Amino acid sequence: LFKKLENNFEKCFQIHQIENTIKGKLSSILANAQFLFDHGLNDACLDKIKQARKLIFEYELFDYYEQLYWLEAPLIPKNKNFQKAHQLLNHEYKSIKSQNDIIKQYFDLSNEIYLFYMNHHFGSPQEQDFNYFVKHDLLKSNYELVPLKAQYLFHYAKTFLFLFEQDWNKAYLETEHQLKLFLKNKKYIDANEFDYINCLGNMLLRMLNPKRYERFEEIKLLLEIALKKYKNNDLCEAKRNHIHLAEWHLSLEAYQFDRALKVMEEMNAQMENTYKRNNISNYISMVYQLAISYFYCDKFMFKMS
């Protein structure tokens, strides 16, 4: 019975993904195209290929191009135009592969920098490693022609270099550059909801150290709208925590201690069970922040007793 329920849940989840995300829709189209191809229904397969091609190029979902290519290439009509059509498709394939390679390079580099930041954040850095990243060719500013995903990863990587140097303002500006890429390209948001929500949450965190709260209400609103549409509960809870945390800092900066206490009590009520279950260090931090809020409101001894 449990297995049956699990399978039904998985099917419902897959249907939801197909109906509600661009990537889910594209995956479904390509799966249907593969089925039609395998059964020799070439005309129907070509219709699906056309639909998939439109989504791939409209939303820069080049990860899916390889599958499209191997469906499309065998279906090129064997007539007098075959050679030209085959050459055009091969040229396109090489161009997309080149873009995917660029994205992969930025992805790998951004992961290396993130790990470097996490490993050395509380210790002494190896100067050679840090200089290697700072001088890396991929982190020079001539990136205008690369795909949006690579541009996003470019700024993501630089953010952690500036965080490592404790240059909070530059880290804020790099995260702001990431957000601009999304806000200028609505379709990029639709195809990359996870990255968009992460970026908005990170913007709230980046505000804290340079104390740049001028865009707080704007970012908070954008994040709340995005969270209503997104179904990853763990991510949504984490980003709601970022909203509470930024509101708490903003309230303390404005000497609005009662508001700060209210924000932290709301956060505690919302996140206590989740943090106890998944992230005890975040739970301890939250209790500490709650204690500070009580202290500022002259309620510390009463609440801690």
Mark where each language-model region is:
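Flexible inter-repeat linkers and adjacent short helices
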Residues: 1-133, 143-145
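Tandem amphipathic alpha-helical repeat scaffolds
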Residues: 29-38, 70-79, 108-124, 152-167, ...
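TPR-repeat structural position
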Residues: 42-43, 62, 82, 168-169, ...
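Amphipathic alpha-helical segments of tetratricopeptide repeats
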Residues: 49-57, 90-98, 133-143, 175-188, ...
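Alpha-solenoid helical repeat architecture
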Residues: 60-67, 101-108, 145-153, 186-200, ...
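Internal metal/ion-chelating core segments
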Residues: 105-230
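Acidic, glycine-rich loop-and-beta core segments that form the ion-binding/anion-interacting portion
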Residues: 198, 202-206, 210-232, 236-268
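Helix-coil-helix junctions within alpha-helical repeat/solenoid scaffolds
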Residues: 252-305
